[in-house]
């Protein structure tokens, strides 16, 4: 299954939340639906359908392909701890996700492009793999040649650098990943237990 590149509002509407980031079109469609008394009711999903939908939501949210997500779940299952929580922590430590959490990009898709286009370094070395697993203590920065790009100034204007306690800012476009976040700190509205149940069948 290839990475989804179609209309993102359509997918976000399916899950009822802006899983790809701020979405003005989604807000407008929700308002319209709320004012439509004759809008069709959603069909009740089966247990399997609910579990599958939660996995799909997690995949779309973090921008993973089916094989990537399956492999990450297998890794989470092999590590100590609660599998669902470990899965969420592995998703959070991906380089593209941390670039997004730093505010350098407004969506994870944009963060992924920054990484693949060689704008990002880890401990001073360019890393162009979005799935790179960042370790606590590593420093993520924008390359020297890219620091002058206006998009970083625009994206970081008014950004709350204290928003995520596991990311410690070093300078305007550089931060340290200080620790693995606890599940309760991860803001994504994902029921990881449903994903565990899906893969346990």
UniProtKB/Swiss-Prot annotation:
InterPro entries from the UniProt entry: Ribosomal_uS4, Ribosomal_uS4_bac-type, Ribosomal_uS4_CS, Ribosomal_uS4_N, S4_RNA-bd, S4_RNA-bd_sf
PROSITE patterns: RIBOSOMAL_S4, S4
CDD domains linked to this entry: S4
Keyword RNA-binding: yes
Any one biological process term the GO annotation gives: ribosomal small subunit biogenesis
Pfam families named in the record: Ribosomal_S4, S4
Coiled-coil residues: none
Keywords: Ribonucleoprotein, Ribosomal protein, RNA-binding, rRNA-binding
Domain S4 RNA-binding as annotated: residue spans: 93-155
Any one annotated GO CC term: small ribosomal subunit
One Gene Ontology molecular-function label: rRNA binding
SUPFAM superfamilies: Alpha-L RNA-binding motif (SSF55174)
Keyword Magnesium: no
Function in brief: One of the primary rRNA binding proteins, it binds directly to 16S rRNA where it nucleates assembly of the body of the 30S subunit.
Complex and partners: Part of the 30S ribosomal subunit. Contacts protein S5. The interaction surface between S4 and S5 is involved in control of translational fidelity.
Family in the record: Belongs to the universal ribosomal protein uS4 family.
HAMAP family: Ribosomal_uS4_B (MF_01306_B)
The name this protein goes by in its record: Small ribosomal subunit protein uS4
Annotated organism of origin: Elusimicrobium minutum (strain Pei191)
